[in-house]
A protein has these predicted regions:
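Ligand-binding "clamshell"
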Residues: 146-159, 325
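Short, well-ordered beta-strand elements
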Residues: 8, 82-85, 95-96, 112-117, ...
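A structural "hinge/loop" feature
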Residues: 17-32, 81, 169, 179-182, ...
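Ligand-site clamp/hinge motif
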Residues: 72-75, 101-147, 285, 297-298, ...
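Periplasmic-binding protein-like
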Residues: 156-172
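Single conserved hydrophobic/aromatic residue that forms the stacking wall/gate
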Residues: 318-329
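Surface-exposed binding/hinge segments that line
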Residues: 1-62
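Append "and occasionally in soluble cytosolic enzymes with long acidic Gly/Pro-rich linkers
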Residues: 96-101, 182-298
Length: 329
């Protein structure tokens, strides 16, 4: 259409909402007029038109993104499409965003600037919120009982709903545990060990709702695991394992007793004596998440599935969870 807009015409008919939210959101437009270069002194051009050139640009941009000391002065990050642009940044993650004078969209900034302050944990953030030292924050699930106190401090408290679910992805590429995860009955048994109702009520203070699958509950509604194909039922989990050749050792580690691919055997790729012991990578800094995984570890141990919980910062979590890494869950 012009130098800032283009059209996409599909050869088939698609649901517009699905196409926009599930396909177009995977396209990330990048400012070639400012970023299509391979060094600070290089002038933007069309190097991105070739695979080799695109890789060189990506390498340069990646290196610049890791240079946190010069983040707020690097001209690369001054190029923005939204109502705000980076004003100040410190290596610990504190960032000040200022209104962009060149933004001509409908949703222009209504404030001149705002500062995003990082915290080491949700408890640390909540302590600052209690003191009234910040304008906007959140109440962690484990602190919901203090809502009235926060309101007396002058804050307005509203639910932070999201159309989302929480799940634990399996690393099927892991050479040790991948063949185990590939067995459907293993995944079924593990789901039978998750007490969604109890976790929702006790750990998340009803800020999270049980669900039966990948489609999230409507925000604000009380979900239930009743009617789910894989309800909380440790007895079913134990039976599934025993029926497939595992020596279930409660509060120990369950091992494969009958290796093989036949009926009553552990399954393809699972060796005799293989253990149901896995490392779970979890995001650090969230008390309720820590408590949830402690509950899962306890529940899974009832049928001899050992979970070693390893908490890491968010950025490390994303890196470790890549399919080629050795993470298990």
């Amino acid at each position: 259409i012009d130098d800032k807009a283009f059209t996409i015409t599909t050869t088939e008919k698609y649901n517009p909402a699905w196409f926009i939210n599930n396909q177009l959101n995977r396209l990330v437009p990048m400012p070639a007029h400012a970023w299509s270069k391979t060094s600070d002194s290089d002038k933007p051009g069309e190097k991105d038109r070739t695979p080799a050139g695109a890789k060189a640009i990506f390498k340069y941009l990646s290196a610049a993104s890791e240079d946190l000391q010069n983040y707020d002065t690097n001209k690369l990050w001054k190029t923005t499409l939204g109502p705000f642009q980076l004003g100040k940044y410190t290596p610990n993650g504190k960032a000040k965003l200022v209104a962009s004078p060149s933004y001509d969209g409908e949703d222009k900034a209504s404030i001149s600037s705002f500062t995003m302050q990082p915290y080491t944990s949700d408890d640390a953030e909540f302590n600052i919120l209690r003191s009234g030292s910040i304008d906007y924050g959140f109440i962690p699930p484990n602190s919901m009982t203090q809502q009235k106190y926060i309101e007396k401090q002058g804050y307005t408290v509203k639910p932070w709903y999201g159309w989302s679910i929480t799940y634990m992805p399996f690393n099927f590429n892991n050479p040790k545990s991948g063949p185990i995860f590939a067995q459907k009955y293993i995944r079924q048994a593990m789901q039978h060990l998750i007490d969604q109702e109890g976790i929702s009520k006790i750990i998340w203070n009803r800020t999270a709702s049980p669900t039966c699958g990948p489609v999230p509950q409507q925000p604000g509604t009380a979900g239930s695991s009743k009617g789910c194909a894989y309800d909380y039922n440790p007895a079913k989990a134990e039976k599934l394992l025993k029926d497939h050749g595992w020596n279930v050792t409660k509060d120990g580690i369950t091992t494969c007793q009958q290796a093989g691919e036949g009926e009553g055997q552990c399954g393809k790729g699972i060796k005799q004596g293989a253990k149901l012991s896995f490392t779970v990578i979890s995001q650090s800094g969230f008390t309720s998440t820590t408590h949830m995984f402690a509950e899962l570890k306890s529940s899974f141990s009832n049928v001899g599935i050992n979970l070693e919980i390893r908490e890491v910062p968010d950025l490390s979590l994303i890196h470790i969870s890549e399919p080629t890494r050795q993470a298990e869950i």
